[in-house]
Amino acid sequence: MSGIDDLPPLRDVIKRHDLSARKSLGQNFLLDLNLLTRIARAAGPLDGATVIEIGPGPGGLTRALLALGAAKVIAIERDERALGALQEIAAHYPGRLEIVCADATIYDPRPLLGGARAKIVANLPYNIATPLLIGWLSIEPWPPWYDTMVLMFQREVAERIVAREDDEAYGRLAVLANWRAETKLLFDISPAAFVPQPKVTSSVVRLVPRETPEPCDRRMLEQVAAAAFGQRRKMLRQSLKPLGVDPARLAAAAGVDPTRRAETIAVSGFVAMARELTDIRAIKSV
């Protein structure tokens, strides 16, 4: 038995269901139920909550979420080998675990939510983690169908999410993430906690969506950030040229010094430039 429920230890579950991790699916299984419980707790009170979990594998995090009182966990798993293990958990928690065998990069869970907001809590497969996050941050209209995300990434990716201006890791991902959410790196997890052991440290990040981010067109913001960070060592008056407008005038009109570099500009500066770009293009289209 485990320390959080009467189900078998995760190592036994993996052996019994022949769940050897597959590199092609980005799988690394976290087996320490204390760590898994810590991740689940980071999402805040779970009583009455609906939680979306991506890539549950043998179900360690699933069990932690249910043991902490989640009213419903919707587990989206692409690997059919894991379904047997998840069905055993579903039997232990009747009516509280819904298993969806699908590709999380294209599956839309909203029809299962009944209009309620959910939490997303997941040890994301490394190979789809960033695309999934960008998709969740790009949802329209905003605010989104979730109220909290607690996600595990490779440490390098986590640093890129929570970075601020003048940080080495600051870039396009940080601009999008911190425009639409409050982000925080919570804690690291050693490679030794996983089976098989990855070559890198993992980090758990919490993102809480801002109900009313600074107003601007997301696509324009992404274009400005892409241009600016595409030549991050150059001044904005040079790096913003791909936008097809006078870069110095664009930056100056937004209240940003065009001789500065992208890595020194706060998210609010990018938002201001995105709004200005929207106005310029609207005038041009008339």
Swiss-Prot record:
Subcellular location: Cytoplasm
Cross-referenced Gene3D superfamilies: Ribosomal RNA adenine dimethylase-like, domain 2, Vaccinia Virus protein VP39
Assigned EC number: 2.1.1.182
UniProt key word S-adenosyl-L-methionine: yes
InterPro entries linked to this entry: KsgA/Erm (IPR001737), rRNA_Ade_diMease-like_C (IPR023165), rRNA_Ade_Mease_Trfase_CS (IPR020596), rRNA_Ade_methylase_Trfase_N (IPR020598), rRNA_adenine_dimethylase (IPR011530), SAM-dependent_MTases_sf (IPR029063)
Entry superkingdom: Bacteria
Residues reported to bind S-adenosyl-L-methionine: 28, 30, 55, 77, 103, 123
Reactions this protein catalyses: adenosine(1518)/adenosine(1519) in 16S rRNA + 4 S-adenosyl-L-methionine = N(6)-dimethyladenosine(1518)/N(6)-dimethyladenosine(1519) in 16S rRNA + 4 S-adenosyl-L-homocysteine + 4 H(+)
Keywords: Cytoplasm, Methyltransferase, RNA-binding, rRNA processing, S-adenosyl-L-methionine, Transferase
Recorded GO MF terms: 16S rRNA (adenine(1518)-N(6)/adenine(1519)-N(6))-dimethyltransferase activity; RNA binding
Chief place where the protein resides: cytoplasm
Pfam families hit by this protein: RrnaAD
Presence of the UniProt keyword Nucleotide-binding in the record: no
GO CC annotations, alphabetized: cytosol
Chain's role: Specifically dimethylates two adjacent adenosines (A1518 and A1519) in the loop of a conserved hairpin near the 3'-end of 16S rRNA in the 30S particle. May play a critical role in biogenesis of 30S subunits.
Family assignment from sequence similarity: Belongs to the class I-like SAM-binding methyltransferase superfamily. rRNA adenine N(6)-methyltransferase family. RsmA subfamily.
NCBIfam families: ksgA
Protein name: Ribosomal RNA small subunit methyltransferase A
Protein source organism: Rhodopseudomonas palustris (strain BisB18)
Record gene name: rsmA
